[in-house]
Structures are given as structure tokens and as C-alpha cells.
Amino acid sequence: MKVAVLFSGGKDSSLVVLLLEPFFDEIELVTFSFGHDDTWTRAADAARELDHPHRRMVFEDGVLEKALEILLCTGYPNDALNYVHPIAVETMAKECKFVADGTRRDDRAPKMSFSAIRSLEDRLHMHYLRPLAGLGGKTIKAMASRYLDFEEMLSERYPASDFEVGLRYALKERHGQREVDRIFPSNHTHTRVIRRKRYVQENEGQEDQACQGIQSES
């Protein structure tokens, strides 16, 4: 089976990849871009560390303009994030039967309602996976730290390649840093995955060999 994961290069979507590995033969990491920045390269770097194929998808014309319009009208990022997120999920659902992302239990945006999820799955005959939906931030950080090295950075430094970072970049280019400061929280952070901890895999391999040795002796 194949699953497409909406991938930012941060710890959340990277943890999703690790959780899905036992269940899928092929995992494709897909990063959506608004086409005017190179933040997607952060996700490409993280994908190489996870050793899964990566692809960049650019939103169709008009999505960025609508998202920026929402940002400027509401003065808050949530509605714009909730506008672009379902578009990304539905775009991938037309190509892949299984689509996953790193939305968490306590996320306000982006986040799809249960009714929207059921409608999407019924309409496109697909499966939408949210492996982190029952987990809080502290739990996710602890689990991700077990298998990943990552750093936390202010979102204004464009550390990852998610919808918020892309909208920050586009808003600054179109309307200046003042509008970014007005709409987005100044202290918001994102994570960037640096590497996958290979020693964990090596230790597990040694443990498996030890268990096999014990079984053969018994």
C-alpha cells in the first residue's frame, strides 16, 4: 500500500512518517508550496534524512490570493490556514487512496472537522489519516525525540515548509513585514528535522539478533 504524507520537514509530520512505516510499502512525502519561496527545500532535506521519496506540489493559481485576502480581512491566520489545508488534502486524495498529515489533538488550525473528513472520504473514496490526532504537544515531542534530532526556531526564520511559513513569506513579499507582525504571533515557533537517529535502528537490530539467539538456544 502507498500513503502520501503532507510533509513540512518538522517533527510532527516526520513522526507521522515513522508511525506509518510498519503499515505501508511506499510512503511519499509531499510538500505544498505557494510557488514564490524556497522554504520547501527544508522539507526536501528532512525527507532525505528519513529516506523516503519527496515531491513538491504548487497550489493552483488563485489559492494564494484567496488565502492572503482572508489573512488581510480577518487579521488572524487560522481561517487562511483552514482554507488551504483541505485543498492540499483533497489534491493528494485524487492521486493516492491514503493521505496523512501531522495535525494534532490541540491544533486549532489547520484542522478539519469530523463532518468535513467524512464528506471528503465518502466523496473521493479515500482514507484520511491523522496519527497524531489523539496526542498533545509534550507527548509528540517526547516520542519524536526518541528517533529524531530536530531544532526549534522562530517561524519568522522560515525553518520548515508548512502552510503558515509559506503564507508568512508571501505576505511579507506582497504587503511588508508590518502586516506579518500584525497578523501572525511574534513568538510562534516551528521545528526543523536535522537527522534520523540511526543508532536507534542499529540498537534495535542488535536486540533482534540477541532475541533470535536466545530463541535458538531454547
Task: Describe every region a protein language model picked out.
Residues M1-V5, G9-S218:
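Nucleotide-activated chemistry modules centered on ATP-dependent adenylation/adenylyltransferase
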